[in-house]
Amino acid sequence: KCDLREHQLAGVNWLVQSYRRGLNVILADEMGLGKTVQTITYLGYLKFVCGVHGPSLVVAPLSVLSSWVAEFARWCPAMRVVRLHTADNKERELLRTEMLSDVRTFDVVLTTYEMAASASMQSIICGRMSWRYLVLDEGHRIKNERTIQYERLRHVRCQRKLLLTGTPLQNNMHELWAP
């Protein structure tokens, strides 16, 4: 059994209320306070309590992708998670085929910024798939709208967006507009 801390529960409640209002949101706090856990709990709540099924796309730096997999297994093991990250072209094609054959076989796709922005994945991530949720971990990575990552992720078809960051926002409206 896993228990949320008080501030994490408040964060999940805020995410749920924001969803009900139809808002895209930024969850920004200091590193290590549990944004990943809050997000996983929130996606689980949407599926198992509200009946809102995915698929959801979580884009994160490679350095934390394994942590996302482990945290899903710990906090919401009933969620079907696919890790979409490989340098092997045959494996990429297999993943692409599996994902396109039946989206009901998974709830969440975890991938990296580099994989999401790669030309070989654009047909899935931005073309054929329609995502329930797009979660961008370390979302400050897309604040520069002149990057390829920003340009490609901008075209992801999704109903809602959640940006996670441990990097403080500056007093700059442009930074809030870019994501």
Residue ranges and their predicted role:
Residues K1-P179:
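ASCE P-loop NTPase motor core, strongest for the SF2 helicase catalytic module
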